[in-house]
Swiss-Prot record:
Keyword Cell division listed: no
Gene Ontology molecular function, alphabetical: agmatine deiminase activity; protein-arginine deiminase activity
Family: Belongs to the agmatine deiminase family.
GO terms of biological process kind: putrescine biosynthetic process
Catalytic activity: agmatine + H2O = N-carbamoylputrescine + NH4(+)
Top-rank taxon: Bacteria
EC number per UniProt: 3.5.3.12
Protein name as catalogued: Putative agmatine deiminase
NCBIfam families, A to Z: agmatine_aguA, PRK13551.1
């Protein structure tokens, strides 16, 4: 057994620290991306082009789709023929750690499509479970095998200074690691991520089908500084969830003992839902979660991605689009804050942060 990353001196940097690059996956799963994923592919392309201005983008695309991806992206990315079941690079890619000598270590978690047989979203996830190790191998990075511990990248945020942010709703979900206690889960995170402290938010975003990943509800924008998804509408189920998170964060400190500065980032004013027009576009596998008309989608501006030169922020043709851009522009004065029309990614079940995974410098 290899020593834990913590014992070996590795830690997980913050997303706002310098990147070597970003991992993404071409969207092709018919049960996630309606109408051959045409609209999603346009959105992915805009995201890739924006990120590529400041860092390398690695795109996993199987041979059958390579010429299609090249028709959108040309030579803007590094193409890797690694098989996948879907395009959620945040959740299937490795968590890459660094040490003080600049060496990298890729953590490979078990992936079971957000809940396995208990409440997973699809049952054919064998390729997805291999993405982290195969990608690390392609990069020539050593791998720390954290299996059978189940975790997705969207379930953790790091401040790069010893603090990890998670939600209880996800990490304590019966579909993840039901045989482990909360204390055992926390210890695994600390050892695997080289961290000192885990902060457990009670909730994520209402009806987030990942069991409420933290990356949809809260994110570090600097040391001891966070954004939190918020609504003032007390009739929205999100209100009580965000309020509980805020109350916890206001009492908490980071690993260094600092209190948090918390910026409230409004959720879209208008509920984002699946429409009748969306439904004919999906083709499902057996055992795959199906969409229904009127289903509320877990839309949140917190699902942004911090690239080297830009912050990419979901946009929903909503009155709060600009509000979110303005708040994040103040948080990131040294980066270009770019709004990306994101409903077509949201229809797949996630957003910009869910389809990207940073590779630290």
């Amino acid at each position: 057994m290899m020593d834990s990353p913590k014992k070996l001196g590795y830690h997980m940097p913050a997303e706002y620290e310098p990147h070597h690059g970003t991992l993404m996956i071409w969207p092709t799963r018919p049960g996630s991306w309606p109408f051959q994923g045409k609209a999603a592919k346009r959105a992915f392309t805009q995201i890739i082009e924006t990120i590529a201005e400041g860092e390398r983008v690695y795109l996993l695309v199987e041979q059958a789709y390579l010429s299609e991806a090249q028709s959108y992206l040309g030579d803007k990315v590094v193409y890797l023929d690694i098989p996948t079941n879907d395009a959620w690079a945040r959740d299937t890619g490795p968590t890459i750690l660094v040490n003080d000598k600049g060496k990298k270590l890729a953590v490979d978690w078990a992936f079971n499509a957000w809940g396995g047989t208990y409440d997973g979203l699809y049952q054919d996830y064998e390729e997805d479970d291999q993405v982290a190790s195969r990608f690390a191998e392609a990069l020539g990075r050593p791998v720390y095998d954290a299996k059978p511990f189940v975790l997705e990248g969207g379930a953790i945020h790091s401040d790069g200074q010893g603090t990890i942010l998670v939600t209880e709703s996800c990490l304590l979900s019966p579909g993840r690691n039901p045989n482990l206690t909360k204390e055992e889960i926390e210890n695994t995170l600390l050892e695997s991520l080289g961290a000192e402290k885990v902060i457990w938010l009670p909730y994520g975003i209402y009806q987030d089908e990942t069991n409420e990943h933290v990356d949809n509800v809260a994110a570090f924008v600097g040391p001891a500084e966070l954004v939190l998804a918020w609504t003032d509408d007390e009739n929205d189920p999100q209100y009580a969830m965000s309020k509980a998170d805020l109350e916890l964060l206001e009492q908490e400190t980071d690993a260094k003992g600092c209190h948090f500065t918390i910026h409230k980032l409004p959720i879209p004013a208008v509920r984002q839902v699946v429409t009748e027009e969306d439904l004919p576009g999906y083709i499902y596998e057996e055992g795959e979660e199906k969409r229904y008309a009127g289903e509320r989608l877990a839309a949140s501006y917190v699902n942004f991605y911090i690239a080297n030169k830009a912050v990419l922020v979901p946009q929903f043709e909503d009155v709060n689009d600009q509000v979110a851009l303005d708040i994040l522009s103040k948080c990131f004065p040294d980066r270009k804050v770019v709004g990306i029309p994101a409903r077509d990614i949201l229809l797949g079940g996630g957003n910009i942060h869910c389809i990207t995974q940073q590779i630290p410098e």
